[in-house]
């Protein structure tokens, strides 16, 4: 194995046989050589350094054993930006990009007036949602909450690296806002919604390596949505726009929770690119 091409060919075959994604080999090789993709492709017949090959083999073996590529290389792209990730946070996913897209598209029909809007991202993890919203819309005053101190360190680092103005709070769901007497115009959350039953269906890469507390509530997957129904009235203004990421089987159940908790709420269930329920948007009025 003397050339970059031979190293890439070996790793692609090795990982495919192990049931991993073939393109993982290229991502790891880019990381271990420090090359841009165009440079890598132009250098396929060049020799690979001994140190680079050693690191590459070690990282390929790690991924074969189930460690996500994103945790090995320490990053993932979200909404066109590079976010730092480690095993203290979930890896940002395309489905969550769709949640952000829907929020940015639909909030205008709710808030026609000018001025700052108070946005709270609950369970921020890597900060992908909060940072993206702060950068995509200057009228948003963004706060982010997480119960994990380690996750908040990652989120804060991402905000600083990307130049996003986000205020971070450690606490359980909306608890920091409730205690501080703060109010929100928009609440967004991608809570742990995978049911205990569905956990068995996840790939071992996700199940054994991403933070369990950020994936599942250990029950039916609805625990945190139910808690939101109790907390939202304590932080909302005259109206609040709520956007949740949901499991693909949870659309009807979460919609029903909202309608039972808030009379007159306007609730929409939106599908993701795969045609599965993924986002709930709800406009809730205080006096209805």
Swiss-Prot record:
Cell division in keyword set: no
InterPro entries noted in UniProt: DNA_methylase_N6_adenine_CS (IPR002052), HemK-like (IPR004556), N5-glutamine_MTase (IPR050320), PrmC_N (IPR040758), RF_methyltr_PrmC (IPR019874), SAM-dependent_MTases_sf (IPR029063), Small_mtfrase_dom (IPR007848)
Highest taxon in the source lineage: Bacteria
Record bears the keyword Ribosomal protein: no
Keywords from the UniProt entry: Methyltransferase, S-adenosyl-L-methionine, Transferase
Name of the protein described by the UniProt record: Release factor glutamine methyltransferase
Function summary: Methylates the class 1 translation termination release factors RF1/PrfA and RF2/PrfB on the glutamine residue of the universally conserved GGQ motif.
EC number: 2.1.1.297
GO molecular function, one term: protein-(glutamine-N5) methyltransferase activity
GO biological process: one example: translational termination
Enzyme type, top EC level: transferase
Endpoints of the signal sequence: none
Residues binding substrate: 190-193
Catalysed reactions, semicolon-separated: L-glutaminyl-[peptide chain release factor] + S-adenosyl-L-methionine = N(5)-methyl-L-glutaminyl-[peptide chain release factor] + S-adenosyl-L-homocysteine + H(+)
Similarity section: Belongs to the protein N5-glutamine methyltransferase family. PrmC subfamily.
Binding site for S-adenosyl-L-methionine: 123-127, 146, 190
């Amino acid at each position: 194995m003397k050339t970059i091409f031979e190293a890439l060919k070996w790793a692609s075959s090795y990982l495919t046989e192990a049931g991993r994604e073939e393109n993982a080999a290229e991502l790891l090789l880019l990381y271990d050589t420090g090359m841009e993709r165009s440079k890598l492709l132009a250098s396929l017949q060049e020799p690979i350094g001994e140190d680079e090959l050693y690191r590459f083999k070690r990282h390929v073996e790690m991924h074969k054993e189930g460690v996500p590529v994103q945790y090995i290389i320490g990053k993932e792209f979200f909404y066109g930006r590079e976010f730092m990730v480690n095993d203290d946070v979930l890896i940002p996913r395309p489905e969550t990009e769709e949640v952000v897209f829907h929020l940015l598209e639909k909030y205008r029909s709710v808030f026609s007036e000018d001025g700052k809007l108070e946005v709270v991202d609950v369970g921020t993890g890597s900060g992908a949602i909060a940072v993206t919203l702060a950068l995509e819309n200057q009228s948003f005053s963004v706060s982010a909450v997480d119960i994990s101190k380690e996750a908040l360190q990652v989120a804060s680092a991402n905000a600083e690296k990307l130049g996003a103005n986000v205020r971070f709070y450690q606490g359980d769901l909306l608890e920091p806002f409730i205690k501080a007497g703060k109010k929100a115009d928009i609440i967004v959350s991608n809570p742990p919604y995978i049911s205990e039953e569905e956990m068995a269906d996840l790939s071992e890469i996700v199940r054994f390596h991403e933070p369990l507390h950020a994936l599942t509530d250990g029950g039916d997957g609805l625990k945190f949505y139910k808690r939101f129904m109790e907390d939202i009235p304590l932080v909302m203004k005259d109206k609040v726009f709520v956007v949740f990421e949901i499991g693909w089987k949870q659309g009807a159940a979460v919609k029903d929770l909202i309608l039972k908790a808030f009379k007159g709420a306007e609730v929409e269930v939106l599908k993701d690119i795969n045609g599965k329920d993924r986002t709930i948007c709800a406009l809730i009025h205080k006096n209805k």
